[in-house]
């Protein structure tokens, strides 16, 4: 996590609904509306303390294997060695920002430039005076292109949607937006898909996402196919063993509220408060969703990207489990925050956003 990292969401939008991101919950009123990573950590620690969560966590315990045989049998490696324990249900919340995803680019074996993934990036200091190429056009690629440009002599920002990215870096004269990479050359140059050559570069930075990994689960339960986790109902529940839920798989979302409704949905299902469709119906829903995405030209590795669909996804889970739908202000603020980024792509975190959500105390200018 790099030192200057800040959220790309206003904190009144990203908070858990029953725990505001200010002094009435887990924050400080004077913090910026787009807080830094240390402030997000503070908020989460306050949340854990407020709801006595720490005492329910077993720290320094690694799950080596999880198998189902009437109950879930977990082999856990802890401070006192390994042991197997039994549980009625299993919720996997191991995240998906740990194992970097680096594309296999022809020529990479003999490419002389240093290569690093954004997962290991900390600051631009090590790029002073360099020619740098950055691969990846999502939030991390945008942030790193702007930050590294302050130190580097030149930054080549490579990937799709070249025209759409120009506004994000137009204020930086040493950032050049380029198309996708075709191959890497042994003299440090890079060949783009249109056969254009750029460089040579001193460093290549991958802001290309992460892999989903569940090494403790058998593949007969969960498979990962080009970063699509299947077979799941509602991007959440294992169809073949519905006492297994995977919380937090979707991306391009407002995380904490989505995690919250997923957890409530699973808890209420386990408690018998609503029934599931038959396994065949859940498979049909999963297959129909995949076909819808495929027909829309969505790559399989992006099937878990919700983006603007996340509001309907939340309400769908809420309706199914008998919870309240999103409050009226939530979608409005989410869409306003999106427009805010489009209006101020290079500096949106420091510009005033005049749409407000839940009562949250933060600087008003």
Model-derived features: where do they sit?
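Short beta-strand/turn micro-motifs composed of small residues
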Residues: 136, 159, 248
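Glycine-rich active-site loop/strand segments that organize a redox cofactor
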Residues: 1-46, 233-239, 276, 284-309, ...
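A conserved short coil-to-beta-strand element within the FAD-binding core of flavoproteins
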Residues: 56-73, 120-124, 160-163, 169, ...
């Amino acid at each position: 996590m790099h030192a200057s990292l800040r959220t790309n969401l206003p904190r009144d939008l990203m908070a858990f609904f029953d725990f505001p991101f200010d002094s009435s919950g887990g924050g400080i009123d004077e913090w910026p509306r787009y807080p830094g990573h240390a402030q997000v950590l503070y908020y989460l620690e306050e949340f854990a303390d407020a709801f006595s969560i720490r005492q329910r966590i077993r720290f320094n315990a690694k799950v080596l294997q999880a198998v189902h045989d009437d109950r879930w049998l977990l082999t856990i490696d802890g401070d006192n060695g390994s042991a197997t324990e039994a549980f009625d249900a299993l919720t996997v919340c191991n995240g998906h920002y740990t194992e970097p995803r680096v594309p296999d680019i022809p020529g990479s074996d003999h490419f002389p430039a240093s290569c690093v993934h954004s997962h290991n990036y900390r600051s631009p200091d090590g790029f002073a005076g360099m020619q740098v190429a950055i691969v990846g056009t999502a939030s991390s690629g945008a942030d790193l292109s702007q930050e590294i440009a302050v130190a580097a002599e030149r930054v080549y920002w490579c990937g799709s949607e070249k025209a759409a990215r120009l506004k994000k870096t137009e204020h930086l004269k040493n950032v050049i937006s380029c198309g996708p990479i075709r191959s890497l050359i042994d003299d440090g140059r890079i060949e783009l898909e249109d056969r254009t050559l750029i460089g040579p570069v001193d460093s290549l930075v991958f802001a290309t996402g992460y892999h989903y990994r569940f090494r403790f689960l058998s593949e007969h339960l969960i498979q990962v196919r080009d970063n699509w986790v299947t077979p799941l109902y509602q991007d959440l529940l294992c169809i073949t063993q519905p006492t297994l839920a995977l919380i937090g798989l979707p991306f391009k979302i407002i995380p904490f509220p989505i995690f919250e409704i997923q957890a409530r949905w699973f808890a209420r299902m386990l408690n018998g408060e609503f029934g599931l469709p038959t396994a065949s119906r859940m498979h049909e829903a999963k297959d129909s969703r995949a076909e819808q995405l495929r027909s829309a030209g969505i790559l399989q590795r992006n099937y878990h990207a919700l983006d603007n669909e996340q509001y309907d996804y939340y309400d769908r889970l809420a309706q199914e489990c008998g919870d309240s739908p999103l409050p009226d202000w939530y979608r409005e603020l989410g869409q306003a925050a999106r427009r805010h980024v489009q209006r101020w792509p290079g500096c949106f975190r420091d510009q005033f956003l005049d749409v407000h959500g839940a009562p949250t105390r933060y600087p008003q200018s």
